[in-house]
């Protein structure tokens, strides 16, 4: 019976300071040789997936926390908020003092006139690492799949959540400076369910690796969830853990699950 193995990207499969570890690449190659379906399951949209991750020989991708799903080159989902409502959303972000970049499956967009200190390093990193995909708001096509914000005033996050609630769910990362705003009705979990149905995988043969709170829907959906050794503490209290990305966590976890030797 075919198996489905899903990997979060940031902090699980990839970090800027260590890229994708060689041990993880070899482990994934072994999984594919064993006939398993291997997929990315990331909060990132396609425009900001690192090239080294894109080059992995995976079956497909769940991106943007479930707003984009592709299997063997076939796009199953490419969801976005469109039209005039996008301008209302932008007004709320400005009013709540939340510098942002808007994501969809094609590009990401930010306001070059609104880059306070809390947002400056992110903008520099994005422009350096993904120059072909960074666009200014003058080019924004009123199509939002996901928003990442760097709030100037975190005391207003409850207000932000309430005002965006008709269209979005908000994931607050206490350990990071940014928060993620996800199109309502979508998550990594909804993407996983869609892939399970499309590939006709037995749910008991599903596995997921993650490290942060946006991975929770994926970890709850698969039969076998495992978190990295340096994962968010609340996840480590709920799911078994492997070692960190710096200590061959993917390879060790796959061995612990009996998927590779």
Language-model regions: role of each:
Residues 3-17, 219:
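Asp-based phosphoryl-transfer active-site loop
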Residues 5, 61, 99, 225, ...:
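Short, well-ordered beta-strand core segments
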Residues 17-117:
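Active-site phosphate-binding/coordination module
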Residues 23, 47-51, 159, 191, ...:
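Phosphate- and divalent-cation-binding pockets in alpha/beta enzyme and binding domains
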Residues 31, 42, 147, 192, ...:
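Residue-level signal for inorganic ion chemistry
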Residues 35-39, 58, 145-147, 204-205, ...:
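Short active-site oxyanion
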Residues 92, 96-209, 213-218, 230:
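Conserved acidic, metal-coordinating active-site core of Asp-based
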Residues 221, 225, 229-261:
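Asp-based, Mg2+/Mn2+-dependent phosphohydrolase catalytic module
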């Amino acid at each position: 019976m075919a198996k489905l193995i899903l990997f979060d990207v940031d902090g699980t499969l990839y970090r800027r300071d260590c890229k994708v570890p060689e041990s993880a690449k070899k482990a994934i190659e072994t999984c594919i040789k064993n006939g398993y379906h291997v997929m990315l399951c990331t909060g990132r949209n396609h425009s900001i997936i690192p090239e080294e991750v894109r080059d992995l020989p995976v079956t497909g991708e769940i991106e943007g926390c479930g707003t984009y799903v592709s299997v063997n080159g076939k796009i199953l989902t490419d969801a976005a908020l469109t039209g005039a409502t996008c301008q209302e959303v932008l007004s709320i972000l400005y009013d709540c003092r939340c510098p942002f970049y808007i994501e969809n499956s094609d590009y990401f967009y930010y306001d070059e006139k609104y880059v306070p200190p809390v947002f400056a390093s992110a903008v520099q990193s994005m422009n350096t690492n993904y120059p072909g995909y960074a666009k200014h708001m003058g080019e924004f096509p009123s199509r939002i799949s996901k928003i990442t914000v760097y709030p100037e005033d975190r005391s207003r996050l409850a207000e932000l959540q309430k005002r965006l609630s008709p269209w979005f769910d908000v994931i607050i990362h206490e350990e990071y400076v940014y928060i993620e705003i996800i199109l309502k009705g979508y998550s990594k979990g909804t993407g996983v369910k869609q892939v399970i149905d499309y590939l006709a995988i037995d749910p008991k043969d599903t596995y997921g690796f993650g490290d942060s709170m946006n991975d929770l829907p994926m970890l709850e959906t698969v039969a076998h969830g495992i978190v990295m050794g340096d994962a968010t503490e609340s996840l480590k209290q709920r799911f078994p853990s492997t070692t960190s990305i710096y200590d061959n966590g993917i390879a060790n976890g796959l061995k612990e699950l009996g998927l590779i030797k």
